[in-house]
């Protein structure tokens, strides 16, 4: 008997099925813009006149710093270049890195580490990190969503100035490894900015669209390596005649250019203290002056082998002058550079591909300009040169603009179909604490899967649907997302009621779960939103690593539970059959009936007193029960009862809740 046997519905829906009503879409939604909301810089584009336009801001720059500042006695709000330019004179009231806070909790390790380096104050509000700044004479707190909304407002204004009319709809990109809470928070930021976020898409996927739009030469496997200011993503996609299918994704939502800057900052702060005996950290302005010059030096080292960092009157009126070589920069960050290769290896494993199967390597994000990063990737792929026909700063916004054009029904966007994936396995708890999978890791989304379950006890009037994500076979090793109950189930023997559980992931990667009692029509549902504690990227990585590390233990535990479930189901099934006079019960002699009843009762009693029995012990007990049942059933067949053969076996089996 198989415990996991019935999947009623399993289908993948294409995100785009109506390209016909293009004019109707445009009139209904208006112009849809594409926004790359970055940790350090943001970028906006629009599909117009048959091509993508990356829109320059009021300073003439095609990328805009993701900075917000409040300055002067009136608390004037500055966003973008104006905010970043006054960072060194107003560090406490200049906010950046909101993307490193969005959708996170105050007590997360990464948040606590970042707080040490930021000049602005972070306060704990119900375990949500809020930014506290002076706005004129008042002290105000802003959520990360509000700060991100201010940046999105700036990007909206940049687009409106160029287009000459109001914009209400946008496609916004997020790192591939953003969890549900972070995606929801990004959508909330759009709403705060007055934008309807019609679609959230993954940054490396957007970059692949930018790269692959004009590629018509058959199926290609594309590895997108996206290393930005604060996040890192790797995605492996196939592109074939305008269909973009994400095969696997991995990354670190807390690794990027700012981490490289921080290593150099710490080096110079220690060096300065060693030479002068003074601690730069005591002066916020001095630290931000150093931060600005270190970032400039890092950029310079992408094209030259050494650069000089000179800052007038850095601390206590003293000037600062030091040389930074490319070799020193690489030494300070080599472990971080090498850490980027692990997700590359993981996506290849997940997609079941070899290095030689990758046709193109696409580099995205400003940090991929670092020569050592380029060299490590080239060496990893045995000397294969990454593609260079794409601007790493603009690629994500470019792809988002194409996607916006497709959704808006703009002509000449080409036959683009985007098939993205969810990053973790999703399932529910069944008898014995087993994680029963409904949607597997790296399944193409949007998707919808259903499975029928049943009750674990006689006359059970309610079932609890407990939802988990993770890669381990037992729920205790995975992460709980939420739970709800289906009640009002009419009294019936165990295994009879049919409860259909449906998991649906929408185009934005957000999970909706419903359950319905097929007998009564009673149903309940749950949407996993920002209020449910979704996993941090660290937890995701730990779970996947744990799943690899403890695979043998997991399998043994799973087999133990399954063997117990099989014995229990077989025993109760036989008990039901011999009690039914229309089936087996009506065909047996009294002596045979007593023999089977006694064997069944012994098995049930043994189960009750041996909760932690091994797989072998469970299997041995099942064999003992079968040794009593099978000769009697065989005797019936030979006496002409073959027509009833199927009655001894179950017609359908459902996992029990």
Curated annotation (Swiss-Prot):
One of its GO terms (cellular component) is endoplasmic reticulum lumen. It is found in: Endoplasmic reticulum lumen. Disruption phenotype: RNAi-mediated knockdown prevents the formation of ER sheet-like structures during mitosis in the 1-cell embryo. ER accumulates in foci throughout mitosis and partially fails to disperse at the end of mitosis. Induction: By endoplasmic reticulum stress. PANTHER family: HEAT SHOCK PROTEIN 70KDA. Endoplasmic reticulum chaperone that plays a key role in protein folding and quality control in the endoplasmic reticulum lumen. Required for ER dynamics during the first embryonic cell divisions. Specifically, controls ER transition into sheet-like structures at the onset of mitosis, possibly by regulating homotypic membrane fusion. This is Endoplasmic reticulum chaperone BiP homolog. The gene is hsp-4.
